[in-house]
């Protein structure tokens, strides 16, 4: 195919999933171009690697392309998509291009409603430490690699499998992980949870007879589909029937310490004493998936232990920004940023924050993501948001959706006030959020910024504000 397709264009190249695929294709020797409405770290990195990145969408951008890659976030009336179709240039969904990359190697696909990015990162890190040098495509920046994708020399490619648009059914990996199954992106499945579960069953049918499905049996919905999975299964979790099982898990100084018991292929493997450089029981489960795969692939135990102990995390997944001074100069607060935007993953992250910073006041700055999700999970949002000590709530990040009555930020604010668990502060514009946080904090607080939209820029703005303040004060001194 390479002698036919040489120039590949990405519409929305700065997106997490798109930029990773673009980087791997660059490393494979393809000429890559792309467009996006904004400039971010991903577009800057791709440009530095040789990609041609254009600001804004224009029909002329696809000139010379042999294929145009699009994600589901790109509408059908995008001028570049229309131009490609008029010129008979193949328009390739992102998941189909990922599937083509997987055909070059043995695929390890990480699926599930929550935890995909962290689990994919843990798997890639453990395999790399074991000397397998995997290729990886991740939906977040792997801090140890400084990128969300890399072309390795080994036999495996590790990637996220996206159920949001059912595109994971395009993949044919040899190893699959299902972390959990929850009601999200239900528009794709006609608001029928049974259809969503059936899609995950069909996902496991993509495995070859020699493949394995690595399933978290702590999740009741994963356990429910277990009898319908016909391919070999490895069960992981805290449950007694898990083959890769964590026991004695405890939080210690922002890390998780636990013992792993392993029963695979009728053999009892030596237990592992793990120190995971991430907080939260949910991350213990994510690490168990990586341990299961590593054990199957005969990665040395010492490499597994070392990789998890030295794991540097993923961008916007409980990303610690350290201590930031309070405006009154009386002390500091701890700043953490997280991508969580579904009530289940939010609850897990907030529980991890409580465990990592016991006894401290927890301040949450949250930007809801999508009106449909806010509508569908409204009561669950009210419940989880009511567990924090102080709350700053913004308007919904639309992600291209039209507003829905009674499913916006103000509606959530009103419902939280009625519930009476916490008194929310509604922040109209995201530009006002950094100052709103500074107005709300006290010395010793833990501040978590959370959401999948533009709130991701807020932690950097807070850090920059502190640096500029210190610089000004230093100059005055």
UniProtKB/Swiss-Prot annotation:
Its main location: cytoplasm. HAMAP family: MurC. Its EC number is 6.3.2.8. Signal peptide: none annotated. This is UDP-N-acetylmuramate--L-alanine ligase. Keywords: ATP-binding, Cell cycle, Cell division, Cell shape, Cell wall biogenesis/degradation, Cytoplasm, Ligase, Nucleotide-binding, Peptidoglycan synthesis. It catalyses: UDP-N-acetyl-alpha-D-muramate + L-alanine + ATP = UDP-N-acetyl-alpha-D-muramoyl-L-alanine + ADP + phosphate + H(+). ATP binds at residues 112-118. It comes from Cupriavidus necator (strain ATCC 17699 / DSM 428 / KCTC 22496 / NCIMB 10442 / H16 / Stanier 337). Pathway: Cell wall biogenesis; peptidoglycan biosynthesis. It is an enzyme of class 6 (ligase). Belongs to the MurCDEF family. It is found in: Cytoplasm. One of its GO terms (biological process) is peptidoglycan biosynthetic process. GO terms for cellular component: cytoplasm. Cell wall formation. GO terms for molecular function: ATP binding; UDP-N-acetylmuramate-L-alanine ligase activity. Pfam families: Mur_ligase (PF01225), Mur_ligase_C (PF02875), Mur_ligase_M (PF08245).
